[in-house]
Design a protein with these regions (language model features):
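Non-catalytic terminal extensions of PLP-dependent enzymes
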Residues: 1-62, 68-69, 73-77, 332-472
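Active-site C-terminal subdomain of aminotransferase-like
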Residues: 211, 215-327, 331-336
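Alpha-helical scaffolding segments of alpha/beta enzyme cores, especially the outer helices
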Residues: 182-186, 190, 307, 342, ...
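Conserved PLP-enzyme active-site core in the AAT-like
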Residues: 88, 92-268
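A short linear hydrophobic-aromatic micro-motif
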Residues: 89, 316-319, 353-358
Length: 472
């Protein structure tokens, strides 16, 4: 509620601190998703101070605030120089990977006649979201069941006269493997179709590795590429870049409107008004770390991933999916007695968060880990926790009320309001608004048994209920 009289800054900050008590920790590497910690206080300070310095600057009109143009040129130029481009490579600074992908899809749509986007099943849902928003149709292709990489022959079969864009991941988020970008980009070029490389998660770690597969703008046929700086760039959240091979493609990503009596609108992104804090934070972070700093952090993250894989090899009940090219690892069960959803809850008791991933297209349920610059120091402790948790959960399954899974599957969601949905969630032990890392095995088990469309409908209702006053 809005107070009648203003509150003091100290009071407000104290309340924020109380609200954050239920959050997962953002530092020290115990949360293997969502957050990226360089473990270097001076880098965080540079990013934070620059962010605050530009907090009130509005990027809506670059002619009013030319500092935003100067900063964007510097950030885009720095990213392009590392990712196969040069000082003349066009690009756009965006709020995140989804917005970068949205612009790449829009550019492809507006420069061609196709209305289909060909993508591997492992491609990020941001592409499906872009298709949904932009009136396009996603055409998914399978990945190799062993390597989990996109299969070029399947991509070739999917490309047709209606194709607007072909997508490859570098790497795919779920399993950390890089698709065969040269082969896929060549196929797209042969058909005269743009090819986008989604390097949102890997674009700022792969370039610093000596043995990274080819994936960037230097690969013939790659016409656009997205790279998040708030991931392995370690910048404050809200920082991504989309690069284009031509000025024509970047112009097609823009939006302008003069068909009204107000000010003329020209947007480089989906957003109009936008604070310049993230842009300044990204610029400062890039310069505070420099190439040598990123090289060191990438090596440490990869060393952590290698140590994790080595340690998991000594736990017979677990296995790594695929052969990751980046410091992202997915752990699946190698023993029917070990349920990965139950395992995640057990590991959480020791203060570690592993991200559950549901089964899909023949890929088993698994636990995702993103390893960062601070992960190496704690990976042995995590392996000890994993080994102990595996021993503790053998043979255990989520405690589900009888018939609940069938009830959920047959539920008419349109006939259930948020209050009733909250009551349904409480039946499986879910308390909305509870602390991060609360038990989720029961929910994940139910979702895992449902078709993707049903999962999505339930997740929408979950989000609606989470933001409902009935959950206060």
């Amino acid at each position: 509620m809005l107070p009648e009289n203003g509150r003091s800054t100290e009071d407000l900050l104290a309340e924020l601190a109380r609200l954050k008590e239920g959050d997962l920790p953002v530092r020290e590497g115990r949360v293997a998703a969502y957050v990226y910690d360089p473990g270097r206080p001076h880098v965080r300070e540079a990013g934070h101070r620059a962010y605050l310095e530009m907090l009130e600057v509005n990027g809506l009109d670059p002619t009013a605030f030319p500092s935003t143009v100067a900063l964007e040129k510097r950030v885009v130029g720095a990213v392009a120089a590392v990712l196969g481009g040069d000082a003349s490579t066009p690009g756009v600074f965006t709020s995140g990977g989804t917005e970068s992908i949205m612009l790449a899809v829009k550019a492809a749509r507006d420069t061609g006649s196709g209305r289909e986007v060909v993508l591997p099943v492992t491609a990020h849902p941001a592409f499906r979201k872009a298709c949904h928003y932009l009136g396009l149709t996603p055409v998914t292709v399978p990945v190799d069941p062993g390597t989990l990489r996109a299969v070029p022959s399947a991509v070739a079969d999917a490309i047709g006269p209606g194709t607007a864009l072909v997508v490859a991941s570098a790497p795919s988020y779920p399993h950390g493997v890089v698709d065969p970008v040269p082969e896929i980009a060549a196929l797209a070029a042969r058909h005269g179709v743009p090819c986008h490389v989604d390097a949102c998660v890997g674009g700022w770690v792969l370039p610093w590795l000596a043995d990274a597969p080819p994936f960037d703008l230097s690969v013939p046929g790659v016409t656009s590429l997205s790279c998040d700086l708030h991931k392995y760039g370690y910048a404050p959240k809200g920082a991504s870049v989309v690069l284009f091979a031509t000025e024509e493609l970047r112009r097609a990503a823009y939006y302008a409107s003069a068909d009204w009596p107000g000010y003329t609108v020209i947007n480089s992104t989906v957003q109009s008004s936008k604070g310049a804090g993230p842009l300044a934070g990204a610029w400062a972070t890039l310069n505070a770390l420099g190439a040598s700093g990123y090289r060191e952090l990438a090596a440490e993250a990869m060393a952590a991933a290698a140590r994790l894989r080595e340690g998991v090899a000594g736990i017979p009940e677990l296995r790594v999916l695929g052969e990751p090219d980046a410091p992202l690892v997915a752990l699946a069960s190698a023993d029917p007695a070990v349920d990965v959803f139950v395992l995640a809850d057990e590991v959480a008791k020791s203060g570690w968060f592993l991200q559950a991933q549901l089964s899909y297209a023949g890929i088993p349920p698994n636990l995702h880990l993103t390893l960062t610059g601070v992960s190496l120091a704690g990976v042995d402790a995590l392996l000890e926790v994993l080994a102990g948790a595996v021993a503790a959960v053998g043979g255990l399954r989520p405690d589900l009320p009888g018939g609940l899974a069938g009830t959920v599957e047959g539920l008419d969601l349109e006939a259930v309001d948020d209050r009733a949905f909250v009551e349904l969630l409480s039946a499986v032990g879910v308390t909305l608004g509870g602390p991060g890392g609360s038990p989720t095995a029961a929910v994940n088990t139910i979702l895992d048994g449902l078709a993707p469309a049903t999962r999505e409908a339930l997740l929408v209702r979950f989000l609606s209920a989470l933001n409902s006053p009935h959950t206060d």
